Amino acid sequence: MFLFICMTNLQLLIAKAIIEKERLNNVDLLFIGDAGNGKNVCYLNKIKPLCQHVSLEANVRKTSTFKTLKRTLYAKKIMMSYKKKYDVVFFANFHVPLIHHILSVISFDEIRTFDDGTNNINKKSVMYQDSSVPFSSKCFRRLMGRKYHKEDILKLDRVHYTLFPEKPNIIEKKEAITLICYNSVASGTSITKKILLGTVYSDAIDKKHEVLSLIQKVQCFIDDRKIDYYIPHPRELSYQFDNVENINSELIAEDIILEFLKQGLRLELYGFNTTAQI
C-alpha cells in the first residue's frame, strides 16, 4: 500500500508522474487544500483513476494555544478513512507540521519525497530556514502526539523525486521525474507570445501594505513589455490587469503553457521564479 499526501496542484501532477513511473498499485491519496477551488477538483479528478481512495481535506486552522494537541486530533480525524499501515508514504512538504502529525498517527516502512515547486532549489525558501527544536520541546510534543520534525524526515527520506536533477537540492538523494515529453511538442513557428506568470503578491514582499504599489508596478511591466497573456497564481485570483488577456482557467500554468507549445507558438515567459519558468 502506498500513500501520497499533496498540498498543491503541481504536487498532484508530480504524484501522478511517480505513480506511472513506478507502476504503483494500491495507492491512496490525501489532498490538503481548499475544497472550493476549482483547480483542486480538476486535478484531483485527473489522478483519481490511479487511486483506490482519495479525499480532500482543509488545512488545520492556525492557533496559538494547544496547537500540537489540536493538530494531532485533526490528523487522527482526517486519517480515519485511511489504512493504519503503508509500505511507502510520498509527500513534498517535509517542513509542514501537519504532515509530521499525519505520519505520527500511522505506521510506514519508508518515506519518499518530491519537489514542492522551486522551494527545494531556492535557498531563500521556507524549506531552508533553520527549524531546530530544543530536546525538551520535542519530548513535550511527543507526549502530545507529534513524533516527527523536519530533521527527522530528512534523515528518513529514502528517495527524492525532482523536476530539476541538475540543480542543487536541499535533499541529495535525487531521482529525476518528468512531467512533459517535449519531443511530442510541435517544433514551433515564428509567432512569439509573451506570458507573465503571477504570484501571491502579499507573499512576494515583506511589507504587506505595499501590495497595491507592487500591483501598479506589475501593470507598468505589462504595458512596457507588451505582455500578451497573464496567468494568475492559483492562490491569487483577486487581481485582473489591463491591456493583457487574463487567463482564468482550471488548468495550472504548466498545463496552459504546454497547450500553447502544442499550438506551435514560441513563448517568452516572465514571472517570479516559478516552476513553470524553469
Segment roles from a protein language model:
Residues 1-30, 185-186, 192-229:
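N-terminal beta-strand-loop-alpha-helix module at the start
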Residues 3-143, 277:
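Active-site and donor-binding regions of nucleotide-sugar-utilizing enzymes
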Residues 4, 15, 254-278:
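A donor-sugar binding/catalytic signature common to diverse glycosyltransferases
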Residues 4, 28-31, 88-92, 111-113, ...:
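Short, hydrophobic beta-strand segments that form beta-sheet elements in well-ordered domains
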Residues 16, 68-77, 98-100, 208-222, ...:
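Well-ordered, non-membrane alpha-helical segments in soluble/globular domains
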Residues 94-98, 231-238, 273-277:
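Short, polar loop motifs at secondary-structure junctions
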Residues 115, 122-195:
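A nucleotide-sugar donor-handling region in carbohydrate enzymes
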Residues 222-251:
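Catalytic donor nucleotide-activated moiety binding site of glycosyltransferases and closely related
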